Amino acid sequence: MHATTIVTVRKGNKVVIAGDGQVSLGQTIMKGNARKVRRIGKGGNVIAGFAGATADAFTLLERLEAKLEQYPDQLTRACVELAKDWRTDRYLRRLEAMMLVADKSVSLALTGTGDVLEPEHGVMAIGSGGNYALAAARALMDTDKDAEEIARKAMQIASDICVYTNNNFVVETLDAA
């Protein structure tokens, strides 16, 4: 998954998803201020960030919103139901995207193979700069920094290293349970 970095951090009473704004086509930067992190669900009670092919990501985001309408306040169930569809539907199986989603209780990654994963250490990252952001965020979890500070610093480090990630960040925060 090229051309983006998305990170989620859950620490203390906050959960954050942050993403950069760069859209690349091959080796060309097409846009620097894309919004790959957004609030979804009833009242914006879920935050989601996506990496991968833009049209594919929007398709999955729409499908997740439909599942959240079907299973309100049940993010895990909505994601599992979406993953089932993703694995069994011929059209959806061809989509090349990943998503990180979070609500007040849980953070999850939805992969292109239909997996639904919860982070072991409260941190997950996807995209071309995901490994850099993940390492940075994990290193910062034992500091006094809050979830948003950790996410921003992790994104800054990823943008300094990954050529497909810029420093035009969108950050969304929720109060955690």
UniProtKB/Swiss-Prot annotation:
In its UniProt entry, what is this protein called?
ATP-dependent protease subunit HslV
GO terms for biological process, alphabetical: proteolysis involved in protein catabolic process
User: Which gene is annotated as encoding this protein in its UniProt record?
Assistant: hslV
Q: What organism does this protein naturally occur in? A: Mesorhizobium japonicum (strain LMG 29417 / CECT 9101 / MAFF 303099)
Per the record, what is one GO cellular component?
proteasome core complex
Location relative to the cell? Cytoplasm
The family line of this record is: Belongs to the peptidase T1B family. HslV subfamily.
Q: Which molecular function GO terms apply here? A: metal ion binding; threonine-type endopeptidase activity
What reaction does this enzyme carry out catalytically?
ATP-dependent cleavage of peptide bonds with broad specificity
Top enzyme category: hydrolase
Activity regulation info: Allosterically activated by HslU binding.
Q: Does this UniProt record's set of keywords contain Signal?
A: no
Q: How does it assemble?
A: A double ring-shaped homohexamer of HslV is capped on each side by a ring-shaped HslU homohexamer. The assembly of the HslU/HslV complex is dependent on binding of ATP.
What superkingdom heads the lineage? Bacteria
